[in-house]
Amino acid sequence: MTDIENKNYIIALDQGTTSSRAIIFDRDANVVCTAQREFAQHYPQAGWVEHDPMEIFATQSAVMVEALAQAGLHHDQVAAIGITNQRETTVVWDKTTGRPVYNAIVWQCRRSTEICQQLKRDGHEDYIRDTTGLVTDPYFSGTKLKWILDNVEGSRERARNGELLFGTVDSWLIWKFTGGKVHVTDYTNASRTMLFNIHTLEWDAKMLEILDIPREMLPEVKASSEIYGRTKSGIAIGGIAGDQQAALFGQMCVEPGQAKNTYGTGCFLLMNTGDKAVKSQHGMLTTIACGPRGEVAYALEGAVFNGGSTVQWLRDELKIVNDAHDTEYFANKVKDSNGVYLVPAFTGLGAPYWDPYARGALFGLTRGVRVDHIIRAALESIAYQTRDVLDAMQQDSGERLKALRVDGGAVANNFLMQFQADILGTQVERPKMRETTALGAAYLAGLACGFWGSLEELRGKAVIEREFEPSLDEVEKEKLYKGWKKAVSRTRDWAREDAE
């Protein structure tokens, strides 16, 4: 037997916005066990979001140890590790000490809005779009990195001297797990930085010049499925993909026109466009995805900033539900939202609006409105935002989706999934395997080390648990959606005067 035949497990490390997880898969792509730890969110100012990079690594290390112990496994039985991560979140650390120079600036953080406005005033918007596939928005890593270099004393000079390293969360974790030996990222994560040319597949010299970022601090960029290095205990690290691209691969959306939506803290809809980098006319991002063998493919992406976080707000701030699972019960207690629309623009609006100055609002309140209606409106807002993105994506690609594959925590909510199908007028497919993001990372690692032999083998493992068919008539569907568009229009530009 070969060495790989003696190793019957893959570990996927899923480093998310609110927690670090480790999921162990067997050869049939079944989950053997899962370990999870939450970590602190830091909000130093309105619109600012930070994480402690050391806590990210500590929790991610701990859950890997926990998962192995829980499964009764030794690291010698693991063929490889696949890593999937919250994207865009920006870490800068000292190459010698391994200590971060500042907290990780999270993808949700809007502190670099003014930097983005200056880029637009300087006429760089079209170049950024054409080269990186991205819109000029604080969401992406480049302006976050510039903020750190501008605001942490001595950091730019230290970066120029080769003393500091930059990475998205995948780079940070791999650097730590390999004891500082490997400084890499993959094409999917690099494509989210606003520093990477998605056509030449290289760091873009002009973007680095525009943002005054030293080339020396950037990681080497590699394919999403190859062996990058080994942990201190000798486990191969064999797959990397940003969380949404990992989910696309885990759903086996590897052919042009296939699409998925992940319902997490935010919502992310990706459509595979194959070897064609489609330039969006409707506010979508052009991004890099994983091809059939982990090579570069392209995708259109629409990012909704507040999905599951809207339900967290109901629970943690308004305290009108005790648990996210309760929202389905309350939403089903009423026949509709009674004309209420909740626009959860807590941190601005993502695709297709890209308005950092929009703010959240409730519309249509009357004395007849109850808590149930507001809870229902919150769930409906997730589906409406998904339609905003999907409509734009279909116009760009010229393709009509026959079905939308879904994953993420909120897909367990049957009310939301049915309303999603209704407001889209499109079948929604919920897979039996809910861990599609982690599964995508596991697939990439497994293909890299020979644990799985082919894409065909992986396709055979996909099972649809339930299909949700549209049940709303066309007139009612469009009436509801028209109300949503009206509500969104009233939230636009709300905070602009405060910022000026």
Swiss-Prot record:
Keyword annotations: ATP-binding, Glycerol metabolism, Kinase, Nucleotide-binding, Transferase
Binding positions (ADP): T17, R21, T265, G308, G409, N413
Uppermost EC category: transferase
Database matches in InterPro entries: ATPase_NBD (IPR043129), Carb_kinase_FGGY (IPR000577), Carb_kinase_FGGY_CS (IPR018483), FGGY_C (IPR018485), FGGY_N (IPR018484), Glycerol_kin (IPR005999)
Regulation of its function: Inhibited by fructose 1,6-bisphosphate (FBP).
EC number: 2.7.1.30
Pfam hit, one: FGGY_N
Binding site for sn-glycerol 3-phosphate: T17, R87, E88, Y139, D243
Binding locations of ATP: T17, T18, S19, T265, G308, Q312, G409
Binding annotation for glycerol: R87, E88, Y139, D243, Q244
Function: Key enzyme in the regulation of glycerol uptake and metabolism. Catalyzes the phosphorylation of glycerol to yield sn-glycerol 3-phosphate.
Official protein name in the record: Glycerol kinase
Taxonomic classification: Bacteria, Pseudomonadati, Pseudomonadota, Gammaproteobacteria, Pseudomonadales
